[in-house]
Amino acid sequence: MKYVYTSILFLLVANFCSAQDILSIFATKGPNAQQSSLELFKRYTNPLAESYSWAISMGWNHTARPHRPIGFDISIGTAAVLIPDNKLTYSVDGIDGVRIISGNPQVPTFFGSNTASSVIGVKNDDGTESIIPATRGVNLSAAPLPFFKFGLGVFKNTELMGRIFPKLEYNGMEIKMWGVGIKHNIIQWFYREKSPFDLSVFAGYTQADGLYPLEQSMVAPVTNPGNMLFTTRGGDFEAILSKTFPLVTFYISSGFAYSKNNLQLVGDYTLLYNKEESLNIPPNGVTEEYELKAWKFGGGIMLKFGLVFINGDYSYSEYHLISTGLGLTLK
């Protein structure tokens, strides 16, 4: 099982550590140039923050029907946020003192091309210009978040739920995730007899954390490149309607996602060959925050063969969202 976990982790982040020279963005001089560097960092990482802010809100439900008391299910699943083309690149337009010296004017974001070779110029406060190679992407079109999920029926058509991706380490990289939720069938308050369908409300909380080693700066090598820390936490609130047949369940949902994402660079950014200087990073470090507040709408299908079920669903909002699962259930 640990081998499976490690393989998933490798697929998720292996490209990251082989392609990104993020620190060179801050090889500039002066407070005005620092703001330009911070804006470049924001435009590069914003799709990463956005996608995982969405990913943690997905994959909770495959039916509106809660388990009976002591009924349960356990499954493995993956939530994936599809990255649109307009999130694979960004433009430096509107950033004070920044220009494209050579190469494509559309620069890769985190998920963009890993072969692009644009060169960016950033005007320093002393009138000089820093020449910086554009940070390459990881060449991925989706942001996946795998997990183990379980649910337990308690009382009055209520189900307690949880999910986890245990902490794993691979070549200095770390990733972990956990979440808790509760689902309650409200249709019982409207139908005295058995309802032809199920209607439930759900609330859940999820937190995902990652740590990625940073590449040494090619422009201005530093004492310790350190890591990029990644934390996403937030809630998911949904109404789910489903219709169950002997072998298949159809479900639709509407909900509100709220989450916060924090990206932080942590290292010793004193220049390796000049201990009197450091990268142009704010005294309190580089911290990029992103907040998501948005509605989402979706639907899916669950196929059940004895105790085994398979489900898949699609949700639409600012991104296209897909989740799948495979598990065992006992009502």
Positions of the model-derived regions?
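N-terminal, post-signal peptide beta-strand-biased segments of exported outer-membrane/organellar beta-barrel
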Residues: A19-G97
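Residues on the lipid-exposed face of transmembrane beta-strands in outer-membrane beta-barrel proteins
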Residues: W60-R65, I74-I76, F148-V154, V180-H184, ...
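Short loop/turn motifs that connect adjacent beta-strands in outer-membrane beta-barrel proteins
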Residues: H62-I70, D85, I187-L199, P246-V248
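Extracellular/periplasm-exposed beta-strand and loop segments of Gram-negative cell-envelope proteins
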Residues: K87-T89, F110, G121-L140, E169-I175, ...
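Repeated loop/turn-to-beta-strand initiation elements of outer-membrane beta-barrel proteins
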Residues: N157-L160, W189-R192, L247-F250, L307-G312, ...
